[in-house]
Amino acid sequence: MAQIRIHEENTRIENEVEVSNFLQGEDVLYEKWNISKLPTHLKENYSLTDENKAEILTLFSKEIADVSERRGYKAYDVVSLSNSTPNLDELLINFQKEHHHTDDEVRFIVSGHGIFAIEGKDGRFFDVELEPGDLISVPENARHYFTLQDDRQVVAIRIFVTTEGWVPIY
């Protein structure tokens, strides 16, 4: 279950209903998908082959199709980041630059953890700490950035409005 941390106050929201209500109030789509169908060989596997990535997409194809139909998404892929990722520190520096997109930024966490820091409607930033099974859609034009949690590893399905993917606007 995702958790929220409000930067300015350093307060946390950890209750499932309160997290869902908070995100809904910020126009952030949040869903919990069933991660238990992930087979053992893909759990906590951060060195994925193309076949592994295709298997992950197949496992969650119904959920991807459902959210895509509801929200107009057109493309998707799987990304894996860990300490074995070449230039991970450089990638994280780039990810941590505050930006926005002209379309939604959607991620479903398969393994590991990630954090989206999002500027709320009141101008204050909050973190959405994500774990396996969490799907988030950061709304278009919302200022945000992404980083990893202390374990520095994540496998995520990225879902896009266009086949070109997101274009960051700094």
From Swiss-Prot:
Cofactor(s) listed: Fe(2+); Ni(2+)
Q: Where does Ni(2+) bind?
A: 99, 101, 105, 144
Q: Which residues bind Fe(2+)?
A: 99, 101, 105, 144
What molecular function terms (GO) are annotated for this protein?
A: acireductone dioxygenase (Ni2+-requiring) activity; acireductone dioxygenase [iron(II)-requiring] activity; iron ion binding; nickel cation binding
InterPro entries linked to this entry: ARD, ARD_bac, RmlC-like_jellyroll, RmlC_Cupin_sf
Record site: Important to generate the dianion: 107
**What highest taxon heads this organism's lineage?**
Bacteria
According to the record, cofactor stoichiometry and binding are noted as: Binds 1 Fe(2+) cation per monomer. Binds 1 nickel ion per monomer.
Q: Show the Gene3D superfamilies listed in the entry.
A: Jelly Rolls (2.60.120.10)
The UniProt subunit note reads as follows:
Monomer.
What is this protein's name?
Answer: Acireductone dioxygenase
Name of the encoding gene: mtnD
